[in-house]
């Protein structure tokens, strides 16, 4: 596997991990908000995780789009 493929897969894995982390945290907030005692401002914190989720999804979409628009790219 060449470096380009490794870099592509590293970025893809990073964004997928960020998406999974944000979704897991949001699931906790939605199902048991009292379980997160150190964050009394639940809406503000949830909004921050929504922003993290949206950013990671956008980056992943962009990365995958680059692969589609230039199939000669070696990844």
Annotate each PLM feature.
Residues 2-75:
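Extended, charge-rich alpha-helical interface modules
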């Amino acid at each position: 596997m060449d470096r380009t493929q490794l870099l592509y897969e590293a970025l893809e894995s990073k964004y997928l991990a960020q998406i999974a982390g944000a979704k897991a945290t949001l699931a906790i907030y939605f199902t048991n908000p009292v379980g997160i005692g150190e964050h009394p401002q639940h809406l503000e914190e949830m909004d921050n995780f929504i922003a993290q989720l949206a950013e990671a999804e956008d980056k992943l979409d962009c990365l995958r789009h680059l692969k589609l628009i230039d199939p000669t790219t070696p990844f």
